[in-house]
């Protein structure tokens, strides 16, 4: 049975235009309070971003839902996530697709996320400590790629790891950021601007 807080969040998401019932069911199946510090658990179902340590955040549920919806996921999809973070977005993806590959440059976050996903019996996820700018080429190509931190421009290395017809959703920009959807058509790519967003930067090269 869903808590009142979860029901209120789902109502808010619907009011903000999230209509995919399969996605909403996945969100309702993931206890967000398990992905934040115990001291912030009372805020877990507020539609807001929360700190998770290491200067990183767990994105607000609307952005998680919006980006996931834009990926147009099918149950047999193989997806790459850049920026595992708390593992919350990863868990929602795991309820929606066949397999999730997730890269995180901060070892402490990767370890915590891996433990949480295991506790929730989500075993269709592979995580890796690595540079998100490089993706995970040995496991590609991917039907979808989601990037949960903002590069100043769209990384070509990630675009090349999309299947033909694959979709990548990511925030782009340094000071002000725009959410973009990029679709691959053969050797060409079509980019579409979605909305203004705010994310932590996608740090290149340096692992932590």
Curated annotation (Swiss-Prot):
It catalyses: [protein]-L-isoaspartate + S-adenosyl-L-methionine = [protein]-L-isoaspartate alpha-methyl ester + S-adenosyl-L-homocysteine. The keyword S-adenosyl-L-methionine applies. The keyword Cell membrane does not apply. One of its GO terms (molecular function) is protein-L-isoaspartate (D-aspartate) O-methyltransferase activity. It is found in: Cytoplasm. InterPro entries: PCMT (IPR000682), SAM-dependent_MTases_sf (IPR029063). One of its GO terms (cellular component) is cytoplasm. Its EC number is 2.1.1.77. PANTHER family: PROTEIN-L-ISOASPARTATE O-METHYLTRANSFERASE, PROTEIN-L-ISOASPARTATE(D-ASPARTATE) O-METHYLTRANSFERASE. Belongs to the methyltransferase superfamily. L-isoaspartyl/D-aspartyl protein methyltransferase family. Catalyzes the methyl esterification of L-isoaspartyl residues in peptides and proteins that result from spontaneous decomposition of normal L-aspartyl and L-asparaginyl residues. It plays a role in the repair and/or degradation of damaged proteins. HAMAP family: PIMT. This is Protein-L-isoaspartate O-methyltransferase. It comes from Photorhabdus laumondii subsp. laumondii (strain DSM 15139 / CIP 105565 / TT01). The lineage of its organism: Bacteria, Pseudomonadati, Pseudomonadota, Gammaproteobacteria, Enterobacterales. The gene is pcm.
């Amino acid at each position: 049975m869903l808590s009142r807080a979860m029901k209120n969040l789902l109502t808010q998401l619907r009011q903000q235009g999230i209509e995919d019932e399969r996605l909403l069911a996945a969100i309702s199946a993931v206890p967000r309070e398990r992905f934040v510090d115990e001291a912030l658990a009372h805020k877990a179902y507020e539609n807001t971003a929360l700190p998770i340590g290491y200067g990183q955040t767990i994105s607000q549920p609307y952005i998680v839902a919006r980006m996931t919806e834009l990926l147009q996921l099918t149950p047999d999809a193989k997806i790459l996530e850049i920026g595992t973070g708390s593992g919350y977005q990863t868990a929602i993806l795991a309820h929606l697709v066949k397999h999730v590959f997730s890269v995180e440059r901060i070892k402490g976050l990767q370890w915590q996320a891996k433990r949480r996903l295991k506790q929730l019996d989500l075993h269709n996820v592979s995580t890796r400590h690595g540079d998100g700018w490089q993706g995970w080429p040995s496991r590609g190509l991917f039907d979808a790629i989601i990037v949960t931190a903002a590069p100043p421009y769209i990384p070509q290395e990630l675009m090349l790891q999309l299947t033909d017809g694959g979709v990548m959703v990511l925030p782009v920009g340094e000071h002000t950021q725009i959410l973009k959807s990029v679709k691959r058509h053969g050797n060409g790519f079509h980019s579409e601007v979605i909305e203004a967003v705010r994310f932590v930067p996608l740090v290149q090269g340096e692992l932590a």
